[in-house]
């Protein structure tokens, strides 16, 4: 099983609900896990980085969610991420599993899902 994971990139959609509280709109973060062979989205959530005082807290919360998901679906053979930053956050985690971790500029299932979602907005 190969998983595509996205958790550090902002979506190109403004959230205006906090404009009055913080004086500006912001872009949500997408947390998504997809299984590459079947094309299934196994986990998807929009999150707001403003809830976390440090990026490490945000990543820790995502890793806990990922652990819970892997308890249900099993350990993948490979995890694909889009960038060096995601890779560095997940490297030690993947070594503990163990599973391979690779950077891939394209995450086909996640890309198709986000493109389809945002083409309708």
Which functions belong to the PLM regions below?
Residues 1-121:
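Secondary-structure boundary/capping micro-motif
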């Amino acid at each position: 099983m190969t998983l595509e994971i996205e958790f550090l990139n902002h979506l190109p959609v403004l959230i205006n609900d906090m404009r009055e509280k913080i004086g500006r709109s912001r872009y949500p973060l997408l947390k998504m896990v997809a299984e590459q062979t079947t094309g299934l989205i196994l986990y998807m959530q929009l999150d707001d980085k403003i809830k976390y005082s440090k990026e490490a807290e945000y990543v820790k919360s995502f890793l806990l969610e990922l652990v819970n998901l892997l308890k249900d679906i099993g350990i993948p053979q490979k995890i694909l991420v889009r960038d060096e930053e995601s890779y560095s956050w997940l490297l030690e985690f993947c070594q503990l599993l163990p599973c391979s971790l690779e950077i891939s500029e394209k995450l086909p299932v996640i890309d198709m899902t986000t493109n389809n979602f945002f083409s309708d907005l």
